[in-house]
Swiss-Prot record:
Binds 1 zinc ion per subunit. Belongs to the KduI family. The lineage of its organism: Bacteria, Pseudomonadati, Pseudomonadota, Gammaproteobacteria, Enterobacterales. It catalyses: 5-dehydro-4-deoxy-D-glucuronate = 3-deoxy-D-glycero-2,5-hexodiulosonate. It comes from Shigella flexneri. Its cofactor is Zn(2+). Catalyzes the isomerization of 5-dehydro-4-deoxy-D-glucuronate to 3-deoxy-D-glycero-2,5-hexodiulosonate. This is 4-deoxy-L-threo-5-hexosulose-uronate ketol-isomerase. CDD domains: cupin_KduI_C, cupin_KduI_N. It is an enzyme of class 5 (isomerase). The keyword Zinc applies. Pathway: Glycan metabolism; pectin degradation; 2-dehydro-3-deoxy-D-gluconate from pectin: step 4/5. GO terms for molecular function: 4-deoxy-L-threo-5-hexosulose-uronate ketol-isomerase activity; zinc ion binding. Keywords: Isomerase, Metal-binding, Zinc.
Length: 278
């Protein structure tokens, strides 16, 4: 488990390129037949990926020991979105078929979660966010047909994009975790511009669906002290509450956003005008 400490905005603005990457970038999300796990002290979110190929991958008691509990989800809830081939997730003996861009919410208290791919030639790639939970909500599969896509932006400003809200109050109940998937239209490059912060929750972006020769310049930092981190395919970045989170790519891309904190209202944002950025 890779543990990342909280960091003050006044400290973050003093960091060089490598310092910013060390604090905020999750460089390797998927490893064959393993799970990756980054634990952030910011709202205690856990971020990672699971890519089973030749065997199943379990997340259970061995992780619980690192969290001071008996098993991984004893006091946590889990959200998973599959960006790869078809797979299965078995939760305490109940098997769910999770296809490409299907998602599964797993409620607090599940003792064993087992991940598998159906075809080793096209393995599943399960990206997940995990957050502390105070009560148990039912485990539920969510498919792309069950979300309500919202298209925002304009081709003229190169930010036309479709937002798919998977884990939000209108779709299912969670304790605090919200997740969704945003896809840029072909030829569009910007996400979340004009940008915002949100004082009441943090966020993690996971960029994917990118060519090897493409990248995203992820904008971060306090609005008057902006910095950037260069992101490549299937990498994630941690965004504290005080930081903007926006990006511009060399080509169109897709990203998964995950938020935890004290408010699940999607539009609870502190907007920042483009003219006010520095």
């Amino acid at each position: 488990m890779d543990v990342r400490q909280s960091i003050h905005g006044a400290h973050a603005k003093t960091l060089d390129t490598q310092g910013l990457r060390n604090e905020f970038l999750v460089e390797k999300v998927f490893v064959a037949d393993e799970y990756t796990m980054v634990y952030s002290h910011i709202d205690r979110i856990i971020v990672g990926g699971i890519m089973p190929i030749t065997k199943t991958v379990s997340v259970g008691g061995e992780v619980g020991k690192q969290l001071g509990v008996s098993y991984f989800l004893e006091r946590r809830e889990l959200g998973v979105i599959n960006i790869g081939g078809a797979g299965t997730i078995t939760v305490d003996g109940q098997c769910y078929e999770i296809g490409h861009r299907d998602a599964l919410y797993v409620g607090k208290g599940a003792k064993e979660v087992v991940f598998a791919s159906i075809d080793t030639a096209t393995p599943a790639k399960f990206y997940y966010n995990c957050a502390p939970a105070h009560t148990t909500y039912p485990t539920k599969k969510v498919t792309p047909d069950e979300v309500s896509p919202v298209t925002l932006g304009d081709n003229l400003t190169s930010n036309r994009r479709t937002i798919n809200k998977y884990f939000v109050p209108d779709v299912l109940e969670t304790c605090q975790l919200s997740m969704g998937l945003t896809e840029l239209a072909p030829g569009n490059l910007w996400n979340t511009m004009p940008c915002h912060t949100h004082e009441r929750r943090m966020e993690v972006y996971f960029y994917f669906n990118m060519d090897d020769d493409a990248c995203v310049f992820h904008m971060m930092g306090q609005p008057q002290e902006t910095r950037h981190i260069v992101m490549h395919n299937e990498q994630a970045v941690i965004s504290p509450s005080w930081s903007i989170h926006s990006g511009v790519g060399t080509k169109a891309y897709t990203f998964i956003w995950g938020m935890v904190g004290e408010n699940q209202v999607f539009n609870d944002m502190d907007h920042v005008g483009v003219k006010d950025l520095r």
